[in-house]
């Protein structure tokens, strides 16, 4: 194949590596249905979360102090023996997200619903998701 700028592509080879990690009962694509927190500065919060093979991706949108904010994050999802999960950020749009870790309590309420609870800025946050 020849491009307009003169480059020629004879063969394209893609190599994909699987990121190390274990599957979990939480693997899937989830959308936030309910968020409980006592932070009145954060409103209209939405989140989509994908969990799979020991990793997660989150996409968030909200109003913070009246201004629209959008963020994303990717990291490891390590299920511990006590059922809690250690989420460690690898890359994201938040400042200092790489290496940021938090312990999260996950619970499957049925096959299509889960909750997660964690502490952020001294506030407990509980979020309920439905499987997409």
What spans do the regions from the language model cover?
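Lipid interaction determinants
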Residues: 1-76, 80, 84-132
């Amino acid at each position: 194949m020849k491009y307009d700028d003169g480059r020629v592509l004879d063969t394209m080879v893609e190599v994909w590596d699987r990121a190390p990690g274990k599957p979990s009962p939480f693997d899937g694509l989830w959308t936030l249905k309910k968020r409980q927190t006592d932070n009145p500065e954060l409103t209209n919060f939405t989140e989509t979360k994908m969990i799979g093979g020991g990793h997660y991706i989150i996409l968030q949108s909200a109003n913070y102090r009246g201004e629209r904010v959008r963020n994303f994050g990717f990291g490891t999802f390590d299920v511990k023996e006590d059922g809690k999960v250690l989420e460690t950020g690898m890359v994201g749009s938040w400042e200092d997200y790489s290496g940021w870790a938090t312990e999260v309590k996950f619970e499957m309420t049925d096959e299509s619903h889960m909750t997660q609870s964690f502490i952020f800025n001294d506030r407990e946050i509980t979020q309920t998701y439905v499987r997409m």
